[in-house]
């Protein structure tokens, strides 16, 4: 993937850039692997806003991604297409299995149209192959890692993400995550070899607010800039600091909200790098 920069023909174009999509081989998705994706606008079933700054955006179809692949152990698949997916930053690869099945997977770096991939304990260590952690050599870069055996890939799914297998001790494998955290994961959990492609995604300059609106992202307005009816931090004469600890529009305290007693925290060997308002 490369990035194409625009000339400053308008204020919105100045400094903006876009992916060149050179790796994309097909512009329309496989019809059997898409589902409708109704807009929710960040609201739940009662109409209450549960996620702010969401709404609008271009119409999308959801691509069904195979995050497990355990039911295709030992079945070879050919990479038929590399496609764009509007629902994630990574590209997706359309696999044609020799038994006639078609599936989408996250497209790792260096996976090209026409390559062959497989899943299973005896698969080779090459990009796109899916194996249990116990069968992957220490030091290998992986992505799409399960947290629980058979639970489907949960970690390392976004563009450019890579996880390194740093050690194996007993029934656990130690993984170094992109955040710097080192975590124990059951060796029966599966992962895909290689790093996720489209790593240049993070270098794209969106250029104008309108491009974010196309993605369904609405403006983020500070509470202190609102009226008292709209936010607990609103109002006051002149500019104010809010006068209280940071809260959300409902009055619930915000900031450092990570649970210190989450059940899975006992599997963390070394916590992620910390900074202001992080744990």
Swiss-Prot record:
GO cellular component entries: large ribosomal subunit
GO molecular function, one term: structural constituent of ribosome
Region Disordered, residue ranges: 1-59, 224-279
TM spans (from-to): none
SMART domains listed in its UniProt record: Ribosomal_L2 (SM01383), Ribosomal_L2_C (SM01382)
Basic residues: bias regions: 50-59, 269-279
InterPro entries listed in its UniProt record: NA-bd_OB-fold, Rib_uL2_dom2, Ribosomal_uL2, Ribosomal_uL2_bac/org-type, Ribosomal_uL2_C, Ribosomal_uL2_CS, Ribosomal_uL2_dom3, Ribosomal_uL2_RNA-bd_dom
SUPFAM superfamilies in alphabetical order: Nucleic acid-binding proteins, Translation proteins SH3-like domain
UniProt entry tagged with the keyword Ribonucleoprotein: yes
Single Gene Ontology BP annotation: cytoplasmic translation
UniProt keyword list: Ribonucleoprotein, Ribosomal protein, RNA-binding, rRNA-binding
Chain's role: One of the primary rRNA binding proteins. Required for association of the 30S and 50S subunits to form the 70S ribosome, for tRNA binding and peptide bond formation. It has been suggested to have peptidyltransferase activity; this is somewhat controversial. Makes several contacts with the 16S rRNA in the 70S ribosome.
Matches recorded under HAMAP family: Ribosomal_uL2_B
Membership in a protein family: Belongs to the universal ribosomal protein uL2 family.
Summary of subunit composition and partner proteins: Part of the 50S ribosomal subunit. Forms a bridge to the 30S subunit in the 70S ribosome.
Name this polypeptide is given: Large ribosomal subunit protein uL2
Gene source species: Arthrobacter sp. (strain FB24)
Classification lineage: Bacteria, Bacillati, Actinomycetota, Actinomycetes, Micrococcales
